[in-house]
Swiss-Prot record:
Name of protein: Protein Wnt-5a
Any Pfam family the entry gives: wnt
Major location (coarse): secreted
Glycosylation-annotated residues: 114, 120, 312, 326
Native species: Oryctolagus cuniculus
Keywords: Chondrogenesis, Developmental protein, Differentiation, Disulfide bond, Extracellular matrix, Glycoprotein, Lipoprotein, Secreted, Signal, Wnt signaling pathway
Signal peptide: 1-35
């Protein structure tokens, strides 16, 4: 959703003798304005539906609640149209965004950039304006989150336009096993996620060969990589039937993989993401042509990552000052790498944990609370 920006106050008249603005300066001012406006527009994202999700409030579903879609921050015009048509889907779009954000923060919890969110509709701040491999991962995991949420909502009967999976019986399923049950509707989840998530990119028009057109292609590719990862990791789940658990009969269905498995797979793709550039035909090609071309499940990026060591308002980097680090680790979570060589401070803190747990018949576990003083380290 675009933010309104006042260009000129009513009291300013162009072309009057009292105006000190020359035509040349005016053109320059407009150029700056539209550049700024572009940044503001790009700052909005549907990811904001995953932050304190407003569409979970019951009052938005009252009859005639059409204003809901126009009031949701971050939606493009195409996404607002889909919102009007499928209002019952919006809660699960928000859940998918939230799932993606949480998984991003888990996967990057020990990295200099830890998927921190900011308090506005951009969700991740200005860092997403850079076509880096971190941006690539974020687009992929959020698109994957929507497929995950929509597929499960169909299975649970929460949506009026879909139900249980209609996936064909796998050819390698044993003949005496039944194919049925109520599986996650991954086909529907994939299709709707593609329609909704890609809508913003497909309605943007930029000159062929421009940086903006490269970002659109990058975003679309990574959205698809996230969706396909969910689709390809889905597997057959089965339940036994029979007397005393003999499992003489099995009923099987299609089931989503645990989303942590999706996050792990996308994190591996992040580590091997392909650097891309636009060719003369306006297509993305690899910077290093000696490598194999990325598949539809690989992540791609067009910009080098910014310096995440220090706070930088222009790139959106929050820096690592104040981040906890592991003194004994030689990995990215270690104080040497996390603190970028600046050193670290040590302090003591009290931790409380459950301990001495015992099982009582029947049927509960009772624990005591134990406290200990531990050393912690934070980057200078």
């Amino acid at each position: 959703m675009k933010k309104s920006i006042g260009i000129l106050s009513p009291g300013v008249a162009l072309g009057t003798a009292g105006s000190a603005m020359s035509s040349k300066f005016f053109v320059m001012a407009l150029a700056v304005f539209f550049s700024f406006a572009q940044v503001v527009i790009e700052a909005n994202s549907w990811w904001s539906l995953g932050m304190n999700n407003p569409v979970q409030m019951s009052e938005v579903y009252i009859i005639g609640a059409q204003p809901l879609c126009s009031q949701l921050a971050g939606l493009s015009q195409g996404q607002k149209k889909l919102c009007h048509l499928y209002q019952d889907h919006m809660q699960y779009i928000g859940e998918g965004a939230k799932t993606g954000i949480k998984e991003c923060q888990y996967q990057f919890r020990h990295r200099r950039w830890n998927c921190s969110t900011v308090d506005n509709t951009s969700v991740f701040g200005r860092v997403m304006q850079i076509g880096s491999r971190e941006t690539a991962f974020t687009y992929a995991v959020s698109a994957a989150g929507v497929v995950n949420a929509m597929s499960r909502a169909c299975r649970e009967g929460e949506l009026s336009t879909c139900g249980c999976s209609r996936a064909a019986r796998p050819k390698d399923l044993p003949r005496d096993w039944l194919w049925g049950g109520c599986g996650d509707n991954i086909d529907y989840g994939y299709r709707f996620a593609k329609e909704f998530v890609d809508a913003r990119e497909r309605e943007r028009i930029h000159a062929k060969g421009s940086y903006e057109s490269a970002r659109i292609l990058m975003n679309l590719h990574n959205n698809e990589a996230g969706r396909r990862t969910v689709y390809n990791l889905a597997d057959v789940a089965c339940k036994c039937h029979g007397v005393s658990g003999s499992c003489s009969l099995k009923t099987c269905w299609l089931q989503l993989a645990d989303f942590r498995k999706v996050g792990d797979a996308l994190k591996e793709k992040y580590d091997s993401a392909a650097a891309m550039r636009l060719n003369s035909r306006g297509k993305l090609v690899q910077v290093n042509s000696r490598f194999n071309s990325p598949t539809t499940q690989d992540l791609v990026y067009i910009d080098p990552s910014p310096d995440y060591c220090v706070r930088n308002e222009s790139t959106g980097s929050l820096g690592t000052q104040g981040r906890l680090c592991n003194k004994t680790s030689e990995g990215m979570d270690g104080c040497e790498l996390m603190c970028c060589g600046r050193g670290y401070d040590q302090f003591k803190t009290v931790q409380t944990e459950r301990c001495h747990c015992k099982f009582h018949w029947c049927c509960y576990v009772k624990c005591k609370k134990c406290t200990e003083i531990v050393d912690q380290f934070v980057c200078k």
